[in-house]
């Protein structure tokens, strides 16, 4: 029978203690959960947006499989995607995050542009010739006669409480003009 002795005490120097970074189990779990959510965001992307992101072949296959899976199989596949992301380098994960943020931000920029177009249309319809002149200075390629006719028709429709056909046409014209630049 072997005798049990004391565990040998390690002689740590201050330099060695400073190099060791202790990570709690909870922090590891939080990081794993965060990567799993990142994987879920990848699964939710459309195929066109997914093609814009450079992913490892195994990760791309796992994401495509998760998109086809349902219920429990999808949950397991998301766990697997999280595992693949945990084994990825920090640069790869940062690239994925930046790409996802860029895609989400692009959507927000488009929404802001559409709101700006609506506001511009309202200013043109409510405003006077000064607003039109300011618009023409900013967008010299605009068809002046066509836009004036649309604004005049929109004002007339509003006075007569008719359907806002010209109002919608102004918006479409502005959208085509500004977004084509």
Swiss-Prot record:
Cellular compartment(s): Cytoplasm
GO CC annotations on file: cytosol
Family according to the record: Belongs to the DarP family.
Known function: Member of a network of 50S ribosomal subunit biogenesis factors which assembles along the 30S-50S interface, preventing incorrect 23S rRNA structures from forming. Promotes peptidyl transferase center (PTC) maturation.
Protein's gene: darP
Example GO biological process: assembly of large subunit precursor of preribosome
GO molecular-function term, one example from the UniProt record: ribosome binding
Protein's name in the database: Dual-action ribosomal maturation protein DarP
NCBIfam families listed in its UniProt record: PRK05255.1-1 (NF003593)
């Amino acid at each position: 029978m072997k005798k049990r002795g004391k565990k040998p005490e390690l002689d740590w120097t201050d330099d060695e203690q400073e190099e060791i970074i202790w990570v709690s189990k909870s922090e590891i779990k939080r990081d794993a959960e965060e990567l799993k959510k990142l994987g879920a965001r990848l699964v939710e992307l459309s195929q066109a947006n997914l093609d814009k992101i450079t992913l490892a072949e195994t990760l791309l296959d796992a994401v495509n499989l998760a998109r086809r899976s349902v219920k429990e199989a999808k949950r397991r596949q998301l766990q697997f995607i999280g595992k693949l992301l945990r084994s990825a380098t920090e640069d790869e994960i940062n690239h994925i995050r930046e790409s996802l943020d860029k895609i989400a931000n692009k959507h927000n920029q488009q929404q802001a542009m559409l709101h700006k177009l609506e506001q511009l249309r309202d200013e043109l319809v409510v405003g006077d010739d000064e607003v039109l002149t300011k618009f023409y200075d900013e967008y010299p390629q605009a068809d002046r006669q066509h836009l004036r006719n649309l604004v005049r028709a929109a004002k007339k429709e509003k006075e007569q409480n008719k359907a806002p056909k010209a109002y919608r046409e102004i918006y479409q014209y502005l959208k085509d003009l500004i977004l084509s630049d």
